[in-house]
C-alpha cells in the first residue's frame, strides 16, 4: 500500500486539520511510523516548486493547504474573502488571550481596564478565539483560548512558539503605557 498517497487523500478530503492518531488509525500504522511519513511529505511538498500545496503541522494535527505563492491565482477564481480587520483593541485582546489562556472575560477586562465584550465576540466570530469551557468558580464564567485558525493565521505550530518578552521589554512596555496614560490624563 502507498501510505503517503493515503495520507494525502485523507488530508485533502478532510479539508481541515486531522490529528496524528486518527491518520495512523486510518492507514493502520503506529504513530511513530505515520509521523515519519508525514515529515517526509512535508519536506517533499516544501522543496518542490511544482506543487502548489503544503502540508502543515498544527499542534499535533496535520492539514493540507495551498502555498502562499498560489494566492494570486486562487483569487482570480474564488471570491475575494471578507477581509478581517484586527484593530488595536482586537490585537490587544487577542494577545492577552493567547498568552494567558485559558482566561475569562473578567480577567481580560482587569488587564485592559475596559469592557472586552465586543472584542471577544469579534475574535470568536473571526474564529481566532473559542470557548474552552467554564471556570470552576462562582458564576462559572466562560474560559477563552485560541483556535487552530489563530495558529495558522500567525504562522506558528503551537502556542509555545509565540515570542516571549524579556523583562527589559516588559519594563519598556510598562513605561510606554504609563507615559500614554499621563498624556491622556493631561488632555
Swiss-Prot record:
It is found in: Cytoplasm. GO terms for cellular component: cytoplasm. GO terms for biological process: cell division; chromosome separation; DNA replication. Pfam families: SMC_ScpB. InterPro entries: ScpB_csome_segregation (IPR005234), WH-like_DNA-bd_sf (IPR036388), WH_DNA-bd_sf (IPR036390). Keywords: Cell cycle, Cell division, Chromosome partition, Cytoplasm. PANTHER family: SEGREGATION AND CONDENSATION PROTEIN B. Homodimer. Homodimerization may be required to stabilize the binding of ScpA to the Smc head domains. Component of a cohesin-like complex composed of ScpA, ScpB and the Smc homodimer, in which ScpA and ScpB bind to the head domain of Smc. The presence of the three proteins is required for the association of the complex with DNA. Belongs to the ScpB family. NCBIfam families: SMC-Scp complex subunit ScpB. This is Segregation and condensation protein B. It comes from Agathobacter rectalis (strain ATCC 33656 / DSM 3377 / JCM 17463 / KCTC 5835 / VPI 0990) (Eubacterium rectale). The gene is scpB.
Amino acid at each position: 500500500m502507498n501510505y503517503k498517497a493515503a495520507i494525502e487523500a485523507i488530508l485533502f478530503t478532510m479539508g481541515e486539520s486531522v490529528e496524528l492518531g486518527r491518520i495512523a488509525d486510518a492507514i493502520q500504522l503506529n504513530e511513530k511510523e505515520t509521523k515519519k511519513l508525514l515529515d517526509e511529505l512535508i519536506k517533499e511538498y516544501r522543496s518542490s516548486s511544482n506543487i502548489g500545496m503544503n502540508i502543515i503541522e498544527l499542534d499535533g494535527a496535520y492539514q493540507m493547504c495551498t502555498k502562499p505563492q498560489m494566492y494570486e491565482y486562487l483569487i482570480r477564481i474564488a471570491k475575494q474573502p471578507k477581509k478581517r480587520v484586527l484593530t488595536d483593541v482586537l490585537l490587544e485582546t487577542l494577545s492577552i488571550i493567547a498568552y494567558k489562556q485559558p482566561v475569562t472575560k473578567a480577567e481580560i477586562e482587569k488587564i485592559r481596564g475596559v469592557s472586552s465584550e465586543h472584542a471577544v465576540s469579534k475574535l470568536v466570530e473571526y474564529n481566532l478565539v473559542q470557548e474552552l469551557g467554564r471556570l470552576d468558580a462562582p458564576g462559572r464564567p466562560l474560559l477563552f483560548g485560541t483556535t487552530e485558525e489563530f495558529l495558522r493565521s500567525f504562522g506558528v505550530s503551537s502556542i509555545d512558539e509565540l515570542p516571549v518578552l524579556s523583562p527589559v521589554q516588559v519594563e519598556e512596555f510598562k513605561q510606554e503605557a504609563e507615559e500614554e496614560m499621563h498624556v491622556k490624563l493631561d488632555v
